[in-house]
Amino acid sequence: MRLRRAAATVITTGALLAAGTLGATPATAVTKPTIAAVGGYAMNNGTGTTLYTKAADTRRSTGSTTKIMTAKVVLAQSNLNLDAKVTIQKAYSDYVVANKPSQAHLIVGDKVTVRQLLYGLMLPSGCDAAYALADKYGSGSQAAARVKSFIGKMNTAATNLGLHNTHFDSFDGIGNGANYSTPRHLTKIASSAMKNSTFRTVVKTKAYTAKTVTKTGSIRTMDTWKNTNGLLSSYSGAIGVKTGSGPEAKYCLVFAATRGGKTVIGTVLASTSIPARESDATKIMNYGFAL
């Protein structure tokens, strides 16, 4: 009798093992996160596969995430010399005084390299640096014409990427009612920009101290520019890319991180605060890496 019971136990245990049910843990489903932002999107940067969407194709104000395209246009210039010097004009200073946006605190009369301007553009989100770059790389005899030309290049770049829901009317995100994109499109702009090694280096830098040349030829050590993207410090594997904010845009963030050879890149638009946009991005990236 005992032998029969033992045999039955062995048979039953074997059947359970074969079926994979003994001690098995049910697979945990990955739950799509809830975010505070009005719109969001993320994709696998290597494959282009969509990982997350929330109103991903709705046009919204982009704030300073616009500067991703500003940098992309500059870096696409033929025969670009990153060490070329740009003299800071009073108009750039007057612009930030009048609009009170984020700035790199560039000094009128100083000579600043294009490379330094890119750091001033992307780390502290300097609208003065954006103006200087637009003035440098636009075409025309007057600053207004050059700026208009540069914005035209930004729109041409968007068109070339097939982004029909994106339009720029400013070089820095301080729009005049026609500066918009979508979470999906901003992600694609960032993905394209990240193909450039200089761009990648700039946007993953946490802090940068520029040494500029003054009107008298002396060297000025600027106050250190700190990256406004807090994820570079708080999220393992973060590699960029750009924050944005404004009365209409609210709180925006284009983000990217690499883990285990997989890069998740995405955007949140119109979140409720700086901590909220970083939390939104963290949730989306965790979700993207778990898929």
UniProtKB/Swiss-Prot annotation:
Pathway assignment: Cell wall biogenesis; peptidoglycan biosynthesis
Stated consequence of mutating S125A: Almost no activity
Catalytic function, reaction form: Preferential cleavage: (Ac)2-L-Lys-D-Ala-|-D-Ala. Also transpeptidation of peptidyl-alanyl moieties that are N-acyl substituents of D-alanine
Annotated localization: Secreted
GO molecular function: serine-type D-Ala-D-Ala carboxypeptidase activity
Species for this entry: Streptomyces sp. (strain K15)
Residue positions binding substrate: K242
The entry's keywords: Carboxypeptidase, Cell shape, Cell wall biogenesis/degradation, Hydrolase, Peptidoglycan synthesis, Protease, Secreted, Signal
The protein's Enzyme Commission number: 3.4.16.4
Positions of the catalytic residues: S64, K67, S125
Leader peptide range in chain numbering: 1-29
One GO biological process term: regulation of cell shape
Primary localization: secreted
Family (UniProt): Belongs to the peptidase S11 family.
Function: Removes C-terminal D-alanyl residues from sugar-peptide cell wall precursors.
An example Gene Ontology CC term for this record: extracellular region
Pfam family, any one: Peptidase_S11
Protein name per the record: D-alanyl-D-alanine carboxypeptidase
The UniProt record lists the keyword Nucleus: no
